[in-house]
Regions:
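Flexible glycan-contacting loops in extracellular carbohydrate-active proteins
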Residues: 327-360
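Short strand-turn-strand beta-turns centered on an Asx-Gly dipeptide
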Residues: 23, 321-326
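Intrinsic-disorder/low-complexity, polar/charged segments enriched in Ser/Thr/Lys/Arg/Asp/Glu/Gln
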Residues: 3, 51, 174, 254-258, ...
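Asp-box/BNR beta-propeller blade signature and adjacent active/binding-site loops
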Residues: 1-185, 192-214, 234-236
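Beta-strand-rich interaction surfaces with strong enrichment in secreted/lumenal proteins
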Residues: 31, 243-250, 294-299, 332-333, ...
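Short, aromatic/His-centered strand-loop micro-motif at the edge of beta-sheets
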Residues: 288-308
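Secretory/extracellular carbohydrate-interaction modules
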Residues: 221-295
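Short tryptophan-centered beta-strand motifs in secreted/extracellular beta-sheet-rich domains
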Residues: 259, 302-322
């Protein structure tokens, strides 16, 4: 009908939307959307058949530090918010699709994870000639023949990528992961205490160095496969000592997530969300739509116990099953108008868990309203 719509980059927790009904002469008052983002750039692509693709980050940064206590010290402009101190939500991005002019969205598939997300020289690697920002929140996309989309993400030479995907990928209803091909599909980074702040004439722009958190270890059965180990690492160089893992699945209002685990230490926090939260962010219990802690007392005698979460955001409830034990009912926090699309696993303790939890695999199945 000629209406113009813009999704705005903001410093809040979400994009804002504004409309123009007079070819851009005037715009409505911007209002919040349900699309999670902080200081990242969104992009739309109108397809030839009328559908709309929305590229954005769908992520939340780590909680703000007391900027007066940061060392080395920040500038006054960085303390007062004129410039940023650090970006911790720009290592992932996603794409959603709408068939009704943006009224409803589906997909929310993780498009690309920053390949530098675990590197201990994240701040200084590469040069400044191709951009100081080593993030993946910039998008340029075009439609190709045969239902394909080509999108360019990122700007720095070390991280930018050109990706081609099929639009049908956004309509898939299952996903699984067993780590036989590594950790490329999950976020596991932990942050090193680093220099904060913007560019000061040499490499480093609002970024912290990182290193590996969760790692692959031999399966206890000795079958030559591997499993992920999450445990506390008592290391004073780290931002904190928790470890975590974040994995994306197709968005759905109803679904089942299955995880094969062996909790050996102080417990595993399992959370389901509608957006990406850092693996080491301990505020996940506040922002997750569903969250619970599984303990070793709930494990089966066998090596692996299957934990299932059957969730329904329309009814605002979920049932958690661990092995053959009675289901635990979980109450939903907040809202999820676009359904859930992220599994977040994290050590339940921030220290002293040297045994940790082994994670063998996980899978997701979408459920329809009739199921």
């Amino acid at each position: 009908d000629g209406t113009l719509m813009i999704y705005l980059r903001t410093s809040t927790d979400c994009h804002y939307v504004t409309y123009s009904y007079d070819a851009g002469e005037t715009w409505s008052k911007p209002v919040p959307t349900a699309f999670h983002s902080t200081l990242t750039n969104p992009a739309f692509l109108r397809l030839e058949d009328g559908r709309i693709l929305f590229f954005y980050n769908n992520s939340r940064p780590l909680p703000e530090l007391d900027k007066h206590k940061v060392w080395p010290p920040l500038s006054n402009d960085e303390i007062n918010g004129v410039w940023e101190d650090v970006f911790t939500n720009r290592d992932t991005n996603c794409v959603a699709v709408s068939s009704d002019e943006g009224k409803r969205w589906s997909g929310f598939r993780e498009l690309y994870l920053n390949e530098l997300r675990n590197t201990c020289d994240f701040r200084s690697s590469g040069s400044n000639s191709s951009g100081r920002d080593k993030s993946v929140h910039q998008f340029q996309a075009i439609e190709l023949p045969y239902n394909k989309i080509m999108v360019h993400v990122g700007q720095h030479a070390l991280v930018r990528k050109i990706i081609i995907f099929d639009v049908d990928w956004l309509y898939e209803k299952q996903r699984s992961e067993n780590f036989q091909y590594g950790l490329g599909s999950v976020s596991t980074q932990v942050y090193l205490k680093s220099v904060s702040g913007g560019y000061r004439g040499f490499s480093g722009h609002c970024a912290w160095n990182r290193t590996n958190g969760a790692v692959l270890v031999p399966d206890p059965s000795g079958d030559h496969t591997e499993a992920i180990l999450l445990k506390n690492t008592e290391d004073s160089r780290l931002y904190n000592n928790v470890q975590g893992l974040v994995w994306n699945f197709p968005s759905s209002a109803k679904g089942v997530v299955r995880i094969r685990v062996n909790v050996k230490g102080k417990g595993l926090r399992i959370s389901l969300l509608d957006h990406w939260i850092n693996p080491v962010d301990t505020t996940v219990s506040r922002y997750a739509q569903f969250t619970s802690i599984v303990t070793r007392e709930q494990m089966c005698p066998a090596i692996w116990t299957e934990v299932q979460i059957h969730y329904d955001t329309l009814q605002k409830t979920a049932l958690l099953y661990a092995g053959n034990l009675e289901a635990v009912k979980l109450e939903m926090q907040g809202v999820a108008p676009n359904g859930l699309c992220y599994l977040h696993l994290q050590t339940a303790s921030d220290r002293g868990d040297n045994e940790g939890t082994l994670i063998k695999s996980f899978e997701f199945d979408m459920r329809s309203d009739a199921e």
